Regions:
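NUDIX/MutT-family hydrolases
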Residues: 143-185
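N-terminal leader/linker segments that precede catalytic domains of diphosphate-processing enzymes
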Residues: 1-79, 84-138, 172-216
Length: 216
């Protein structure tokens, strides 16, 4: 029964995703999630993250990592597996799956890419392509201690509930900036990861309007 219900949800999500990674159009004037006082003055850095829908006996969940406290940037924060798109990566999906293997030993053969969410531009000048995939693991995920402190999953049902989200306010450059925040099992997901999770929530619950997602 859980498998049938899970398949229905997966089909629904898949129908709302882009079939190909969204191309960046510099002329479109895309704004970042927050605007720094000093614009970077260089093209944004392509990056990709994996939003992994993990199939378990009890239902679907989404995979997150707790970054190592030893990392120079975003240490100790909650994140999706992912990172910069390397020149050797064929596309965003290739980059996201490579990073997932390097970070948590997620086997590429156990992942089926459903599609892509619209680009997410960060105030730190990263242009992120969220890659959505169904994962059916045959072994536990193993954190790479050089990058990841721990790995955990949050039930999809919980993340599809609007009441699971609140807003979090921080200051950058003397200006207040708000992000989404998710609390679960004593852990707090905020910033880019929470914003992307909320976008995924909104995308999954939006009315059916066509074969693939539009906007973000």
């Amino acid at each position: 029964m859980q498998t049938a219900m899970g398949d229905d949800i997966i089909d629904r999500i898949s129908s709302r995703l882009l079939r190909e990674p969204e191309a960046f159009d510099p002329a479109a004037g895309m704004l970042p999630d927050w605007v720094p006082d000093t614009p970077p003055g260089r093209p944004p850095v392509p990056a990709a993250v994996l939003i992994a829908l993990v199939r378990r006996a009890e239902g679907l969940s989404i995979l997150y990592t707790e970054r190592s406290p030893e990392l120079r940037s975003h240490s100790g924060q909650i994140a999706f597996p992912g990172g910069k798109v390397d020149p050797t990566d064929s596309d965003a999906a290739d980059a996201a799956l490579r990073e997932a293997w390097e970070e948590v030993h997620l086997q590429r053969s156990e992942a089926r890419v459903l599609g892509f969410m619209p680009l997410y531009y960060t105030g730190t000048n990263y242009l992120i392509t969220p890659v959505v995939a169904v994962v059916e693991p045959t072994a536990p995920f193993i954190p790479n201690p050089g990058e990841v402190r721990s790995v955990f999953e949050v039930p999809l049902d919980y993340l599809m509930t609007p009441g699971s989200y609140s807003t979090f306010h921080i200051k950058r450059g003397g200006r207040e900036h708000s992000t989404w925040q998710i609390e679960h099992s004593g852990l707090v997901i905020w910033g880019i990861t929470a914003n992307l999770t909320r976008r995924f929530h909104d995308l999954a619950l939006q009315p059916e309007t066509g074969r693939s997602a539009e906007g973000g």
